[in-house]
Amino acid sequence: MSDIAERVKKIVAEQLGVKDEISNEASFVDDLGADSLDTVELVMALEEEFECEIPDEDAEKITTVQQAIDYIQSHT
């Protein structure tokens, strides 16, 4: 697993309080129980960790762990 993937999963686990193994295919809302506020906070945490800005229109498209990993890899 890449360093980015590990860091993204760590942030997801911390932000959403997930104790179990997080799969790359996991949906923030459907699988991990996030609500709209959780997803906003998650995006803010990713922006801070990776020192990047995720525009709202891009953030709306990031709904799974893998999409977050892919976005960070292509924008950092």
Swiss-Prot record:
Gene Ontology MF terms in the entry: acyl binding; acyl carrier activity
Keywords from the named record: Cytoplasm, Fatty acid biosynthesis, Fatty acid metabolism, Lipid biosynthesis, Lipid metabolism, Phosphopantetheine, Phosphoprotein
Chief site of localization: cytoplasm
Residue span, Carrier domain: 2-76
Gene Ontology CC annotations of this record: cytosol; membrane
Keyword match Protein biosynthesis: no
UniProt keyword Lipid metabolism, yes or no: yes
Intracellular or extracellular location(s): Cytoplasm
Gene3D superfamilies reported for this sequence: ACP-like
GO biological process, one term: lipid A biosynthetic process
Post-translational modification: 4'-phosphopantetheine is transferred from CoA to a specific serine of apo-ACP by AcpS. This modification is essential for activity because fatty acids are bound in thioester linkage to the sulfhydryl of the prosthetic group.
PTM sites of type O-(pantetheine 4'-phosphoryl)serine: 36
Role summary: Carrier of the growing fatty acid chain in fatty acid biosynthesis.
Protein name, entry field: Acyl carrier protein
